[in-house]
Design a protein with these regions (language model features):
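SAM-dependent methyltransferase catalytic-core segment centered on the flexible catalytic loop
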Residues: 2-54
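Flexible, glycine-/basic-rich loop-and-beta segments that form/coincide
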Residues: 95-152
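Conserved Class I SAM-dependent methyltransferase catalytic core
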Residues: 36-88
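Short catalytic/ligand-binding loop motif for oxyanion handling, primarily in non-cytosolic enzymes
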Residues: 16-18, 61-64, 117-118
Length: 175
């Protein structure tokens, strides 16, 4: 499938080096260090004109920007900001954070070549409850399709197999 995908959607299994975060993700799935992530042949999957949507937490922003370059893309903007609500109540969800109690998570947008967006009315905010560890809201996939159209797309590090998406990942419920 070399050069096939116009959209690559990724939520890498970041390995945290900061004290206190080590092992949190590992309780749920295998993680990867930045050097290991950078060696993945993602550039080979991308069409000449393609978009990468890459989830990153704020502590991982430098690594996310490095990964974008390693995969052959150029950072453009923040595609989405996920404002997390509690799962069982109407309030906001707050993580522990480093300096302040964290809530939001960002999905970065990077391009290769000159992809064209199909809609100009896709908003950046996603306000939805947290789910199981690290699972992103379905609304993100819906917004990607609205923004880019029904083009060949793949989700890396997938935890499920949504209709219309090719998937790759260790955490698939079924293949």
């Amino acid at each position: 499938m070399i050069g096939k995908y116009s959209v690559i959607y990724a939520d890498p299994p970041w390995r945290y080096a900061q004290k206190g975060l080590q092992g949190a993700a590992e309780k749920h799935y295998p993680t990867m260090g930045i050097d290991e992530l950078c060696t993945l042949p993602v550039a080979d999957l991308a069409a000449p004109d393609s978009v990468l949507f890459l989830w990153a937490t704020f502590p991982q922003l430098p690594e996310a920007l490095r990964l974008i370059k390693a995969w052959g893309f150029t950072y453009k903007s923040v595609a989405f900001v996920w404002l997390k609500k509690n799962r069982r109540s109407e309030g906001w969800f707050y993580g522990l954070g480093f300096w302040t109690r964290g809530n939001a998570e960002v999905c970065l947008l990077a391009t290769r070549g000159h992809p064209k967006r199909q809609a100009a009315n896709v908003h950046q905010f996603i306000i939805s409850p947290i789910q199981e560890h690290s699972r992103k809201p379905e609304e993100a996939r819906e917004k990607i399709v609205a923004l880019m159209g029904d083009v060949p797309r793949v989700e890396l590090f997938a935890r499920q197999s949504p209709p219309g998406w090719d998937v790759w990942g260790l955490s698939l419920i079924h293949i």
